[in-house]
Amino acid sequence: MHFLSEDLEDYVAAHSQAEPELLAQLNKETYQKVLLPRMLSGHFQGRVLSMLSKLIRPSSILEIGTYTGYATLCLCEGMQENGIVHTIDIKEELVDFQRKYFDKSPWSNQITQHLGDALEIIPTLNKKYDLVFIDADKENYINYFEMIVPKMNKGGIILSDNVLWSGKVLEPLQKNDLSTKILLEYNQLLNNDPRVETVLLPIRDGLTVSRVL
C-alpha cells in the first residue's frame, strides 16, 4: 500500500534523483516476468535507500530478502570502494535473475548471494555490518533483529521495510493474522529497545531507520 495519492507520488518521483537506467530495466523486467512485482522497492524508495547508503558509506552490507535485486543495487551505490554485500533469499528461481543484473552493475564481484533460510545463514556469516536491510518474511522480523544487533558495528544502521503493512497496524487485529501481530510487536520493540534509536518513515509501505548505539 502507498499512503500518498498517485499524483503526489508522481510529483515526489519527478523531484527526486532519476532512476538509473540499469534499475529501470530491472524494474521493467520484474513487472514483466516475476510474481508479485509490487514487492520491488521501486524508483522513489530506491532513491531513498541509495541516499541513506551514500550518507552511511558502509563497507559491509547485509540484505535479508533479495527479491530481484533492485534494493541490493540501490544500497551498493553508497558502498565504499572495497565494500561487500551479503544478500539472502529463499527463492531459488530468482537467483539467476538477480545475478544477471548484479553482473551488469559495477559491483558484480562485491555481491555474494546466499540461497536458503536467513535464520540458518545469518549465524554462519562471521562479519560485522555497517548497514542491514530487512525485507523478508514479516513473521521473523524480531528474530532477524535479535540475530543482527550483535553483528552490527557501533553506529550501524538497520533498515526495516513494510513496517506499516498496508495500514493494518492501525486496524483491529485479526485472529490468524500473524504477520501484523509480529509487526506490531516489532515496531514496539524498535521504539523501546535501548540498543537502538529509531525513526519510522511513512515511505511507501513504511520504512524504519534504526541506529545501533
Spell out what each predicted region is.
Residues 19-23, 179:
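Generic alpha-helical segment signature
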Residues 38-40:
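N-terminal small-domain helix-loop-helix segment of the aminotransferase-like
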Residues 43-213:
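S-adenosylmethionine/decaboxylated-SAM
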Residues 1-20, 34-35:
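N-terminal auxiliary segments of SAM/dcSAM-dependent transferases
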Residues 8, 22, 45-48:
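Short N-terminal amphipathic alpha-helix/helix-capping patch enriched in small hydrophobics
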Residues 26:
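Beta-strand-loop-alpha "switch" segments that mediate conformational coupling across diverse proteins
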Residues 35-36, 59:
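Short, contiguous, well-ordered secondary-structure segments
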